[in-house]
């Protein structure tokens, strides 16, 4: 595939996994995610990687901070809201609604191995821990 062309809204809304990599290019990666009520992405930082998030359905709380232990900004987000997280900023997105939070994310450059599918957050955390070892 030379690139990716598709209905990103449909792709996002139909996704039932915690995280699925849809496309990986040399400088950009597209993933779709689904968070259960009360579930979060998990506080994280990407050194050298900018991240764009867009909520297609649901409501949540975005937390941004300069360090792992600091929340400097909190923002409520819902359908059609976007968030840009610059490289080096600690962040989390928590589903504060009663239904699934459906979103897609762009990483520049790519963050996850091409073809990654994490059915659950626990699976994603285990894979990330294995990468760190």
Residue ranges and their predicted role:
Residues 1-31, 42, 74-78, 119-133:
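A short, N-terminal "cap"/entry segment at the start of jelly-roll beta-barrel domains
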Residues 31-47:
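Conserved short histidine dyad/triad with adjacent acidic residue
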Residues 40, 63-65, 71:
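Compact, glycine-rich, soluble single-domain proteins
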Residues 48-65:
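Glycine- and acidic-residue-biased ligand/ion/polar-headgroup-sensing regions
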Residues 67-87:
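Short acidic-glycine-tyrosine-enriched beta hairpin
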Residues 78-79, 87-113:
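Ligand-binding loop in jelly-roll beta-barrel domains
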